[in-house]
């Protein structure tokens, strides 16, 4: 679940201002267990903390920020990502319960779209594919993917491997990826 994860891993000495579509700007990491204030939650109903200068605003203002192109990066989860950058993250098909949320606005309003996801499904099927099989959230919108196994860019209709787990061979990674990985040099 990507909601809240980026705020957990902000590098020391660097500052990012995080936005949640339910109306908080500049939230921080998750509070310690037992210290949650359930009036301070993100769009995924996870408790958050506030950083200095945080602000609250109406949901309509939040989506004006999103739709107005004021977000540098949207970080979303995914059921599937295609090598051309297509994203499927709101429906698992006829048997699932669809949940669009604000993802369609985010993929069109943010300057860049990054995905955080497991590399494979619970039953071991690749989530990174030549083409998505599920209903799309956005067409050609994803530029970077952070999976449980690798960091992959989407460029010129290809998956470009940037980083991988050190103990994982490229062949093993390719075997669980549903499209060819381009390896531009040492990884």
Kindly give the residue locations of the regions a language model identified.
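N-terminal low-complexity or amphipathic/hydrophobic leaders
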Residues: 1-26
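Conserved phosphate- and dinucleotide-binding cores of soluble alpha/beta proteins
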Residues: 26-186
């Amino acid at each position: 679940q990507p909601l809240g994860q980026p705020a957990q891993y902000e590098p020391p000495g660097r500052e990012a201002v995080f936005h949640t579509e339910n109306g908080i700007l500049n939230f921080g990491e998750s509070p310690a267990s037992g210290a949650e204030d359930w009036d301070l939650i993100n769009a995924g109903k996870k408790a958050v903390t506030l950083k200095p200068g945080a602000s609250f605003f109406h949901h309509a203002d939040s989506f004006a920020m999103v739709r107005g192109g004021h977000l540098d990066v949207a970080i979303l989860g995914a059921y599937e990502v295609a090598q051309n950058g297509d994203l499927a993250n709101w429906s698992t098909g006829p048997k699932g319960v669809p949940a669009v949320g604000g993802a369609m606005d985010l993929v069109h309003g943010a300057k860049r779209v990054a995905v955080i996801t497991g590399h494979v499904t619970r039953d071991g099927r690749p989530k990174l594919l030549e083409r998505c099989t599920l209903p799309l959230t956005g067409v050609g919108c994803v530029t970077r993917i952070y999976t449980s196994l690798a960091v992959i860019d989407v460029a010129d209709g290809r998956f470009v491997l940037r980083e991988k787990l050190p103990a994982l061979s490229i062949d093993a990674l390719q075997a669980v990826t549903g499209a060819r990985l381009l390896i531009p040099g040492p990884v």
